[in-house]
């Protein structure tokens, strides 16, 4: 008879212990309901980047002296610098500069070691595309600073030239006007 009573007592103790654990976990859950959310709603809210954030590289074509220091310090030899030696003035003339951001590891060595400070890191971090070849930026694309990280409703594109071109191409060609 005693083993049966001790079994009931053990069962009762285990039940009380389980109820206490459930109560503690419920109290923790309730304490989290008063907190503000940690995550942000990404497409609608953008996270504020830090001052030392290493985003897309900005390139200033006029400052570059084609010394290729950026290529030498890059761990993956990524920047492509095309230049031509001007024999009459004995200086290099930069022809083309490009970086493939699909391969870039954003280490910032090229920016740090550039002697003319023609490279800088921007706060732009949205570089995703459906085609990886679109991530190969030339000097024109690298020279553009982002207007805004988000689409601003105050900035509107001028589609006047595009619409007038479409109107011209929609008309069928008249062979008499072309020959006369």
Swiss-Prot record:
Membrane topology reported for the UniProt record: Peripheral membrane protein
Any GO BP annotation: photosynthesis, light reaction
Subcellular location: Plastid, Chloroplast thylakoid membrane
Plastid listed as a keyword: yes
Cofactor(s) listed in the protein's UniProt record: [4Fe-4S] cluster
Key words, A-Z: 4Fe-4S, Chloroplast, Iron, Iron-sulfur, Membrane, Metal-binding, NAD, NADP, Plastid, Plastoquinone, Quinone, Repeat, Thylakoid, Translocase
Start and end residues of each 4Fe-4S ferredoxin-type domain: 55-84, 95-124
A cellular component annotation (GO) from this entry: chloroplast thylakoid membrane
Residue numbers binding [4Fe-4S] cluster 2: 74, 104, 107, 110
SUPFAM superfamilies: 4Fe-4S ferredoxins (SSF54862)
Residues engaged in binding [4Fe-4S] cluster 1: 64, 67, 70, 114
Enzymatic reactions: a plastoquinone + NADH + (n+1) H(+)(in) = a plastoquinol + NAD(+) + n H(+)(out); a plastoquinone + NADPH + (n+1) H(+)(in) = a plastoquinol + NADP(+) + n H(+)(out)
Domain of life of the native organism: Eukaryota
Annotated InterPro entries: 4Fe4S_Fe-S-bd, 4Fe4S_Fe_S_CS, NADH_quinone_OxRdtase_chainI, NDHI
Name of a matching Pfam family: Fer4
E.C. no: 7.1.1.-
Enzyme category, top tier: translocase
GO molecular function annotations of the record: 4 iron, 4 sulfur cluster binding; iron ion binding; NADH dehydrogenase (ubiquinone) activity; quinone binding
Cofactor note: Binds 2 [4Fe-4S] clusters per subunit.
Functional description taken from the UniProt entry: NDH shuttles electrons from NAD(P)H:plastoquinone, via FMN and iron-sulfur (Fe-S) centers, to quinones in the photosynthetic chain and possibly in a chloroplast respiratory chain. The immediate electron acceptor for the enzyme in this species is believed to be plastoquinone. Couples the redox reaction to proton translocation, and thus conserves the redox energy in a proton gradient.
Complexes and interactors: NDH is composed of at least 16 different subunits, 5 of which are encoded in the nucleus.
Protein name in UniProt: NAD(P)H-quinone oxidoreductase subunit I, chloroplastic
Gene: ndhI
């Amino acid at each position: 008879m005693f083993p049966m009573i001790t079994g009931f007592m053990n069962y009762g103790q285990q039940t009380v212990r389980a109820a206490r654990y459930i109560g503690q976990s419920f109290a923790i859950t309730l304490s989290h309901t008063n907190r503000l959310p940690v995550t942000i709603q990404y497409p609608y809210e953008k996270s504020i980047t830090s001052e030392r954030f290493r985003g897309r590289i900005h390139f200033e074509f006029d400052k570059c002296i084609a010394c290729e220091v950026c290529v030498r310090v890059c761990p993956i030899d990524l920047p492509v610098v095309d230049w031509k030696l001007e024999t009459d003035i004995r200086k290099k003339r930069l022809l083309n500069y490009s970086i493939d951001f699909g391969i870039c590891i954003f280490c910032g060595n090229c920016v740090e070691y550039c002697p003319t400070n023609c490279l800088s890191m921007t706060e732009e971090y949205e570089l995703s595309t459906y085609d990886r070849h679109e991530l190969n930026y030339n000097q024109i694309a690298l020279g553009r600073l982002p207007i805004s990280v988000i689409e601003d409703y105050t900035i509107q594109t001028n589609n006047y030239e595009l619409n007038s071109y479409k109107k011209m191409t929609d008309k069928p060609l008249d062979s008499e006007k072309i020959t006369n």
